[in-house]
């Protein structure tokens, strides 16, 4: 039986970089990893409202200085008036990590929302939760193919589509999405839509271009 490889993990070190960049000895590794998970869980709760697409966590050698780089399509919501939103984020994060941690938060605006798989998946989720037909929601997501930075897109929705008793998956692809080509710059995201018929899964693959190293 065929197994599918995660498009981002498959390309780590080639076209993708690690979302957590730090080193730790065996004694402290699990503690720092758990802290990262708590931070991501908290920020992912804000992802839909603030259009957060990616979270990068960097630490120093001791692990007590944390740098959060948050990529978002709506930076104004996170930053707030005069940076009040950043202070609130830091205060809330410090509630579930040790007091000796120093946090620096950088909010990075996504340059092109039409070339970001996470934000496109959020758009599909929003439409599904607003009871838009799933085929129409997928078709609207495919409009991003008109952007010059996107050469191909694939969108898949799975679950009790249109309230059917039996769950199934349907997908549509436009352009090229070469998942087996390591040099292909693939962006991938998975989301969940809570509908009256249950939870629907949404997956989006974006093929931007091929990265040729000299």
Swiss-Prot record:
Keywords: Chloroplast, Plastid, Ribonucleoprotein, Ribosomal protein, RNA-binding, rRNA-binding. GO terms for cellular component: chloroplast; cytosolic small ribosomal subunit. Gene3D superfamilies: 3.30.300.20, Ribosomal protein S3, C-terminal domain. It comes from the Eukaryota. InterPro entries: KH_dom-like_a/b, KH_dom_type_2, KH_sf_prok-type, Ribosomal_S3_C_sf, Ribosomal_uS3_bac-typ, Ribosomal_uS3_C, Ribosomal_uS3_CS. It is found in: Plastid, Chloroplast. The keyword rRNA processing does not apply. PROSITE patterns: KH_TYPE_2 (PS50823), RIBOSOMAL_S3 (PS00548). The keyword rRNA-binding applies. GO terms for molecular function: rRNA binding; structural constituent of ribosome. Its main location: plastid. CDD domains: KH-II_30S_S3 (cd02412). Residues 39-111 form the KH type-2 domain. It holds the Pfam family KH_2. GO terms for biological process: translation. HAMAP family: Ribosomal_uS3_B. Part of the 30S ribosomal subunit. Belongs to the universal ribosomal protein uS3 family. This is Small ribosomal subunit protein uS3c.
